[in-house]
Design a protein with these regions (language model features):
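Conserved phosphate-binding elements of NTP-dependent enzyme cores
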Residues: 1-942
Length: 942
């Protein structure tokens, strides 16, 4: 086997004929500026080629179903192993996917409960029992000696109906007696019961007196009767002591000896909330139900109904529903013009939930000869009808704005039915284990075998071993604060990536090439060492690990470093260094200069004092927050810190940002629970600059997102040639007919279907990739067509448009955030998360601000090199200098040390976090002995 992986002549995206060598079974870090070509080399070249080779082993028929797998633009790659990519982008949005299901720990717990769990009755709390027919006969013979008994088969348990057919069926089978609601009666033709009442019905199989001289004969008869009764009662029989009128149940299945309820034999799917066997019947295994939120139905009770106080109805219209409400309110001496707060509670209850009495509608309104009487079901029932019956996306979106998620009242958020929740091991059901964080769960698993009997221990030993192994992998990647029932959709990119990393370590594969994209995202310095050790463990198992990373600790721990640069975009794409970390420190690449201390991000000489105004948030209780009160000083650079899972994102992204978005933009996103907010009037808007893509189609690009493309098109429309031809702005759009090339629909390329081979994308032979038709391209500004402008990098465009004031600021903003290397027309699907975030930031920078804007950024250093961070922070400092407030959630110490004000959450993640440990200037926060952040911050402030 080759001792190394070699890449020759890689030219994907901006790579310039790159040759690299990667030692096999090493931990290799790819580093360099954002946009230098790291991901192009790791994912778009090495991973893409590995995946293509794997798919080529399939038959042509199978390949037809696997989508496109183009060969990357590379001369050759030798020594390539099977490749597994672990990226951040593939977070699962399915509400049924949880940490437990993703890591398979929950699957092993289901197996453990199915094989070693003890069942208890959800009715009486008694331990469930099960018997063989022989054991049942023995117990009846001993318990009912010398007594007269009835042997019955239960048919109906607490259900409504007249049961005429059931009685007739039993009569035809030859049975003479039936017990209905505790009373034994003779079965007669046409017998029935009250169909509107709940009934318990048992058929009498036999009656006998035990004891006496004919014991053996009686035993034989009893055995036959029990067998017949078991078949008729589907494994359950009832013995009625005639003299004492006492009933007792026996079953071949798990059964409550007191009430007679029986369970199916346990199987793993009974404990799955994704299976009909185990899911709660009300919420279908989701743990939550949709409820109508009255605060959203009537947000302002100072308004009257005529003016639109009831939002779903809007303002008064000449419609039946308003006539009904008016008629109802008249009974309480109110009208549609009475403010809601002045309408009696009983009247509003009837408006919302309906009235039992008929309402009189005046004959003039309905154009009849006499008054019209109607019933009224209420606004809530009307809304529910829309929710249930309108399948259109518009109808659902309209109804969604009045809905809030509430905990399911049936399962109390546990997702499982009551039978599944009745199985216990060491006094815990499976849902209680899923609620524990990983650290608590490990303690439970470590001691559970001490609380099992010998049989349970024998069954559980291998299952417990597998669970313990997977738990330890999660702890190793710093996810001790997560609970198994945490939805995958609520995880950050870094968290979901580290879960997949833990799953891969658990899979025990060898001779594999793993490629990871910044696994340290969202990870506190405290947990970094454990993550590095996990990657080394993956390497030591016999795998090669490539990590695209900017983290200093990761680089120093690597066996091999590939530094790509020297700059980004067209000025990048070259290997400026490859070798060991020790050798790299001796070079003068940009990365090496930051590692050896030649360059660094300077600590500001003084911190801002702000504008004296604040934003105060009190009583925050979302997720793990423990009644947090926090004050944000405005006009400052605020950094929110803390270990992973300490509550930073819950406080900012799930509480503060939705509150402000609802206030300024009537956003539908609901904030987490909080008590109050003060000081909103001190800001005029909130801007959330996240890392989601700026567009999901190849047609969107930085020019269209920032809005500068509209200005560029208008510039071309105003040119003399365009005016002579009568061109409008649409002529210069590649999205609409007119000016675009119709041969390719404005894409610039055509997709050729190859049937059993991958589709091939070739440049359009008519426009040659220009996207526009010949006539449109004849209109030129300073010798350049609209297609030439889209093909310019931002740096080129800044020079080109330097004398065009309506265009320059928007393009200059892109340059200021370090995106000078990207093209104006570059497809948004090729931009990284960090690049997308900076395009959004540039768009905001180009807008006129009032100096009262609040900007929120969640880990903006994701995907950024030391130099990129310096440029980004300069931009953010300028925003604050203009009077705005910037709140950043961040672990990167180069950002934390630049803060004017720090809010430190912790001390741990999950249940051990959720408190505000300290706040203030970095120098003050660094003195806190309880905080992990403080220990690391104190070192960089020296």
């Amino acid at each position: 086997m080759n001792e190394k992986i070699e890449v020759f002549g890689a030219r994907v995206h901006n790579l310039k004929n790159v040759d690299i060598t990667i030692p096999r079974n090493s931990l290799t870090v790819f580093t360099g500026l954002s946009g230098s070509g790291k991901s192009s080399l790791a994912f778009d070249t090495i991973f893409a080629e590995g995946q293509r080779r794997y798919i080529e082993t399939f038959s042509a028929y199978a390949r037809n179903f696997l989508g496109n797998m183009e060969r990357p633009d590379v001369d050759k790659i030798t020594g390539l192993s099977p490749v597994i990519s672990i990226e951040q982008k593939t977070t699962n949005k399915n509400p049924r996917s949880t940490v437990g299901t993703t890591t398979e720990i929950y699957d092993f717990l289901r197996l453990l409960y199915a094989r070693a769990g003890e069942a208890y009755s959800y009715m009486s709390g008694e331990k469930m029992v099960k018997y063989t027919e022989e054991k049942v006969v023995d117990m009846i013979m001993s318990d009912y000696q010398d007594r007269k008994i009835y042997i019955l088969s239960p048919l109906v348990r607490n259900r409504k109906g007249h049961y005429r057919e059931l009685f007739e069926q039993m009569r035809r089978k030859g049975y003479l007696y039936i017990r209905v609601d505790g009373e034994v009666q003779e079965l007669t033709r046409g017998m029935k019961v009250d169909r509107y009442k709940n009934h318990n019905i048992e058929v009498v199989i036999d009656k006998m007196k035990l004891g006496g001289t004919e014991n053996e004969t009686l035993r034989e008869r009893l055995a036959k009767t029990v067998s017949t009764a078991m078949k008729q009662g589907e494994g359950l029989i009832m013995i009625l002591d005639n003299e004492r009128d006492e009933a007792k149940y026996f079953s071949k299945r798990l059964m409550d000896p007191v009430t007679g309820i029986a369970y199916k034999d346990p199987a793993p799917n009974i404990f799955s909330f994704n299976s009909p066997e185990g899911a709660c019947p009300q919420c279908k295994g989701l743990g939550v139900i949709d409820e109508i939120d009255l605060k959203k139905v009537i947000p302002d009770d100072k308004l009257d109904i005529h003016s639109g106080a009831i939002v779903p109805l809007g303002k008064y219209k000449n419609q039946m529903i308003f006539w009904q409400i008016d008629a109802l309110l008249k009974r309480y001496d109110c009208s549609l013009k009475t403010p809601v707060k002045d309408i009696p509670k009983e009247a509003m209850d009837e408006v919302l939930y309906g009235s039992l009495e008929k309402l009189k509608i005046a004959k003039e309104l309905v154009h009849t000869t006499s008054d019209y009487f109607v019933s009224f079901d209420g606004i809530i029932k009307y809304l529910r009808a829309v929710m249930e019956n309108d399948d259109s996306s518009a109808g659902k979106k309209w109804a969604d704005q009045f809905i809030a998620e509430a905990q399911c009242p049936e399962c109390h958020g546990h997702r499982l039915n009551r039978e599944a929740l009745s199985y216990k091991i060491w006094d815990k059901n499976i849902a209680e284990l899923a609620e524990m964080d990983i650290t608590e769960l490990r303690d439970w698993i470590d001691h559970v075998e001490e609380h099992m009997n010998e049989k349970q221990r024998t069954i559980a030993v291998e299952i417990v071993k597998e669970i313990r192994k997977r738990i330890n992998f999660l702890l190793d990647v710093g996810l001790d604060y997560l609970a198994l029932n945490r939805q995958s959709a609520t995880l950050s990119g870094g968290e979901s990536q580290r879960i997949r990393l833990a799953t891969q370590i658990g899979s025990q594969l060898v001779n594999v090439l793993y490629i990871l994209d910044e696994p340290s995202i969202g990870l506190h310095q405290r947990d970094n060492e454990r993550l590095i050790n996990s990657l080394k463990e993956l390497r030591d198992m016999g795998n090669t690990v490539i990590v695209v990373e900017h983290d200093e600790d990761m680089m120093r721990a690597a066996d091999w470093i590939v530094d790509i640069g020297p700059k980004a975009g067209r000025k990048g794409g070259e290997v400026v260094f490859q070798g060991t970390p020790a050798d790299m420190l001796k070079t003068h690449t940009l990365t090496a200069q930051y590692l050896n201390g030649e360059r660094k991000i300077e600590i500001p000489k003084e911190r801002r004092e702000g504008n004296g105004k604040t934003l105060q948030l009190t009583g925050c209780k979302g997720n793990n927050l423990k009644d947090v009160d926090v004050t944000f000083p405005l006009g400052e650079l605020i950094v929110v810190t803390g270990v992973s899972g300490s509550g930073k994102s819950t406080l900012i992204n799930e509480t503060l940002q939705p509150i402000l978005s609802q206030h300024f933009y009537r956003s539908l996103k609901r904030p987490m629970p909080y008590k109050s907010i003060e000081g909103i009037d001190n800001i005029d808007k909130v801007v959330n600059v996240d890392q989601s893509p700026i567009g999901r189609t190849p047609r969107s690009n930085p020019a269209t997102y920032t809005g500068v493309f509209s200005d560029i098109r208008q510039l071309f429309v105003n040119l003399p040639e365009a005016k002579i031809r009568g061109y409008k702005p649409g002529r210069f759009s590649f999205n609409v007919k007119g000016g675009r090339c119709e041969a390719c629909g404005g894409n610039g390329y055509k997709t050729i279907e190859m049937n059993f081979l991958p589709d091939v994308m070739v440049p359009c032979e008519v426009c040659h990739g220009k996207r526009y038709n010949r006539e449109t391209l004849e209109v030129r500004f300073k010798g350049k067509s609209i297609a030439d402008v889209l093909d310019m990098t931002v740096n080129m465009a800044v020079e080109f448009f330097e004398n065009v004031p309506q265009i320059l600021p928007k393009i200059k903003a892109l340059q200021d955030v370090g995106l000078g290397y990207i093209k104006l027309g570059q497809s948004s699907t090729t931009l990284s998360g960090g690049e997308s975030q900076r395009v959004k930031l540039a768009t905001e920078l180009a807008k006129r601000d009032t100096g009262k804007t609040l900007y929120i950024l969640d880990e903006p250093t994701t995907g950024l090199h030391f130099e990129d961070i310096r440029i980004l922070m300069d931009v953010l400092q300028k925003l604050v200098d203009r009077g705005n407030t910037v709140i950043i959630i961040e672990h990167n110490l180069d950002v934390i040390k630049l803060a004017d004000y720090i809010i430190d959450m912790g001390p741990e993640g999950g249940r051990g976090g959720g408190r505000m440990l300290s706040c203030g200037r970095p120098e003050e926060v660094a003195k806190n002995k309880e905080s992990y952040t403080s220990r690391f911050l104190a070192k960089v402030l020296k």
